């Protein structure tokens, strides 16, 4: 129980007694407790992925209209900053360009200079003396491809644009790193998630004493905001808050994006 209270407090920003009551009302179900906290106006919206954190780094490699990215986890940040560890991850990013796969297990069996990727990771772990895990790999082939890694190496992004130029692709990659979009279009959002959000917002508005006749308008406005916070083209552009990403791109558009974040 105490572990759940601690976790939900960190995730929602709610007080201990509020979290404890919500968990009791939800019979220990954490997701239901979060929904109750939101309905009661106590908790902010919680994004999926705001959970446990791991150490490690993300690296990418680009070759013309192709790009690849890897996430490799370590037990400690000290090792994540180790030169041998970083050199291995850089080599893995280059290898991922050749492997052309989004499947980690397939990538582990890919051979580089006579050695499998899996063995390369194991050898580095043995040398450093810490468990190292190849967690994710991404490969992208498109029209206008760019990558971005945040200065601390914890966040990496690949982007492919239809139209536009390299500068715009890099700007969008930086935006994706900073603003964490979850979807490329509204159609990608599960209808069940929207209905759940609508129910929470409706219950919250009614609990606040809002008149029934205006609750629907309030909720639809908030659903619009829900999309604007999560759907990439609808987000406010990070480098110019007078524009959405779609308006910044003009005639160009995003074909695909991939975002890795350590621990997410």
From Swiss-Prot:
Subcellular location(s) of the protein: Cytoplasm
Keywords of the record: Cytoplasm, Elongation factor, Protein biosynthesis
InterPro entries hit by this protein: EF-Ts_dimer_sf (IPR036402), Transl_elong_EFTs/EF1B (IPR001816), Transl_elong_EFTs/EF1B_dimer (IPR014039), Transl_elong_Ts_CS (IPR018101), UBA-like_sf (IPR009060)
GO BP terms, alphabetized: translational elongation
Residue segments, region Involved in Mg(2+) ion dislocation from EF-Tu: 76-79
SUPFAM superfamilies according to UniProt: Elongation factor Ts (EF-Ts), dimerisation domain (SSF54713), UBA-like (SSF46934)
One of the record's GO cellular component terms: cytoplasm
Pfam families in alphabetical order: EF_TS
MF terms in GO: translation elongation factor activity
Domain of life from the UniProt record: Bacteria
HAMAP family, per database record: EF_Ts
Family (UniProt): Belongs to the EF-Ts family.
Summary of the function given for this chain in its UniProt record: Associates with the EF-Tu.GDP complex and induces the exchange of GDP to GTP. It remains bound to the aminoacyl-tRNA.EF-Tu.GTP complex up to the GTP hydrolysis stage on the ribosome.
Record protein name field: Elongation factor Ts
Source organism of the structure: Deinococcus radiodurans (strain ATCC 13939 / DSM 20539 / JCM 16871 / CCUG 27074 / LMG 4051 / NBRC 15346 / NCIMB 9279 / VKM B-1422 / R1)
Lineage of the organism: Bacteria, Thermotogati, Deinococcota, Deinococci, Deinococcales
Gene that this sequence comes from: tsf
């Amino acid at each position: 129980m105490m572990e759940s209270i601690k976790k939900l407090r960190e995730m929602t920003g709610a007080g201990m007694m509020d979290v404890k009551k919500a968990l009791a009302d939800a019979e220990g179900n954490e997701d239901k407790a979060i929904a109750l906290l939101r309905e009661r106006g106590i908790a902010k919206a919680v994004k999926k992925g705001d959970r446990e954190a791991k150490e490690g780094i993300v690296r990418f490699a680009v070759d013309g209209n192709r790009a690849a990215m890897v996430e490799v986890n370590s037990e400690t940040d000290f090792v994540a900053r180790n030169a041998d560890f970083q050199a291995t991850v850089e080599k893995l990013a280059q290898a991922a360009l050749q492997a052309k796969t989004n499947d980690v297990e397939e990538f582990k069996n890919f051979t580089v200079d006579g050695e499998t990727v899996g063995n390369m990771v194991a050898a580095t772990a043995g040398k450093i003396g810490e468990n190292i895990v190849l967690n994710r790999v991404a490969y992208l082939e498109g029209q206008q491809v760019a990558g971005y890694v945040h200065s601390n190496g914890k966040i990496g992004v690949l982007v492919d644009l239809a139209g536009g130029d390299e500068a715009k692709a890099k700007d969008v990659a930086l935006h994706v790193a900073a603003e964490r979009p979850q979807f490329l279009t509204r159609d990608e959002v599960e209808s069940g998630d929207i209905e759940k959000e609508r129910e929470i917002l409706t219950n919250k508005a009614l609990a606040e004493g809002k008149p029934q006749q205006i609750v629907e308008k309030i909720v639809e406005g908030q659903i619009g905001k829900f999309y604007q916070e999560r759907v990439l083209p609808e987000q406010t552009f990070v480098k110019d808050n007078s524009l959405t990403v779609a308006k910044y791109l003009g005639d160009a558009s995003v074909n695909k994006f991939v975002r890795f974040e350590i621990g997410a």
